[in-house]
């Protein structure tokens, strides 16, 4: 079974070594590695070439392609098109792969050669109070996942090259949320099944969550802008606007200026905060196991701030994406739902 591992890079000099070292340490060696560089200006391609030369005995053939200006979708498509294997395993620069990642990711094909795609999992490399709080707020734990509805990130996923071709590749018109639309297109190929993806929770990759609120804002602004461009999660965004623009002002107004029982406003605010932060606080029990009691309290206090920053970033980014979509409404690629037919709406981490 020939397996090609593909990834894209752009100015990843500071992070790419983690991925390359973990690729060299795989218990199931890939048959080839294809990397597409989007035109890095920080010497990433040179670093990759030097690493490959130094670790030639530990690596399969490595093909490095340079495609200046390629976004992540274009980079993945270029790498997959150049890959020789009928099975593609995709990951991202900057992650650290578990040594058994590839072995676990391709194992379903040994049990069922008709497997179409496999969804791996991802866990945070969180070491300090802030990154632990960030991970608990925005990332699911294995216990949160329903295998029948899980849509994988392309930092840990495998699929046949035929499935990629039938999906039309990754959508190059979309700069963010591109792997979500690709997942929908793969799922549409197995309409009689709950999911086209076999869930492989032990195919794990580790990555570092955002280390500042500024970078987190930018990330979630772009995610929501991608939602707007692709017309994703209308109800979810509507609920967010209603919460912040209607429910929250109403509760605050009653708490401070109500004509009767102002305590009801405060009670509503407290209940809202608890519901808002309950699951992240529960995740802190697992993710913050190595923190001191004081550090866990500090992480718990950060959770509401992280949630608010993420939500405000989404509320700022989503209408920008919607406006972009309206300006480009004549683009046939935007009508992806029509092309896929009645596609099921699966849950994603939010």
Regions found by a protein language model. Give the residues of each.
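Catalytic donor/gating beta->alpha subdomain of glycosyltransferases that bind UDP-sugars
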Residues: 171-234
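Acidic donor-binding/catalytic loop of UDP-sugar-dependent glycosyltransferases
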Residues: 43, 93-108, 184
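Short aromatic/hydrophobic "clamp" motif used to bind/position activated sugar donors
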Residues: 88
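Membrane-embedded multi-pass helical conduit in multi-pass membrane proteins
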Residues: 246-324
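A conserved acidic beta->alpha catalytic loop
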Residues: 29, 37-46, 95
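Short, acidic, metal-binding catalytic loop of nucleotide-sugar glycosyltransferases
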Residues: 21-30
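Glycine-rich, basic loop-to-helix element that forms the pyrophosphate-binding segment
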Residues: 67-83, 104
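Conserved donor NDP-sugar-binding/catalytic core segment of glycosyltransferases
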Residues: 100-130, 194
């Amino acid at each position: 079974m020939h397996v090609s591992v593909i990834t894209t890079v752009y100015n990843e000099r500071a992070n790419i070594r983690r991925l390359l070292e973990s690729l060299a340490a795989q218990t199931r060696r890939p048959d080839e590695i294809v990397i597409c560089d989007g035109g890095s200006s920080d010497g990433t391609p040179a670093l990759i070439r030097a690493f490959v030369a130094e670790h030639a005995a530990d690596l399969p053939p490595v093909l490095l392609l340079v495609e200046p200006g390629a976004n992540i979708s274009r980079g993945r498509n270029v790498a997959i098109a150049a890959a020789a294997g009928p099975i593609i395993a995709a990951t991202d620069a900057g992650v650290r792969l578990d040594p058994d990642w590839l072995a676990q990711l391709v194992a379903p094909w040994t049990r069922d050669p008709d497997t179409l795609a496999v969804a791996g999992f991802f866990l945070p490399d969180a070491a300090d109070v802030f990154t632990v709080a960030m991970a608990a707020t925005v990332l699911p734990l294995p216990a949160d996942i329903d295998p029948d509805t899980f849509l994988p990130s392309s930092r840990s996923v495998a699929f046949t090259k035929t499935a990629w071709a039938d999906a039309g590749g990754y959508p190059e018109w979309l700069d963010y949320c591109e792997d979500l639309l690709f997942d929908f297109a793969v799922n549409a190929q197995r309409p009689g099944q709950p999911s086209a993806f076999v869930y492989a929770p032990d195919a794990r990759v580790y990555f570092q969550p955002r280390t500042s609120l500024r970078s987190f804002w930018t990330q979630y602004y772009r995610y929501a802008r991608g939602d707007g461009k692709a017309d994703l999660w209308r109800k979810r965004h509507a609920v967010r606007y209603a919460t912040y623009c209607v429910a929250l002002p109403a509760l605050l107004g009653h708490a401070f200026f109500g004509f009767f029982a102002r305590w009801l406003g405060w009670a509503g605010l407290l209940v809202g905060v608890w519901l808002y932060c309950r699951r992240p606080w529960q995740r802190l029990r697992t993710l913050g196991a190595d923190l001191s009691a004081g550090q866990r309290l500090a992480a718990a206090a950060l959770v509401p701030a992280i949630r608010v920053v993420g939500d405000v970033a989404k509320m700022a980014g989503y209408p920008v994406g919607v406006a972009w979509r309206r300006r480009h409404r004549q683009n046939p690629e935007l009508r992806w739902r029509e092309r896929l037919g009645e596609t099921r709406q699966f849950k994603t981490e939010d």
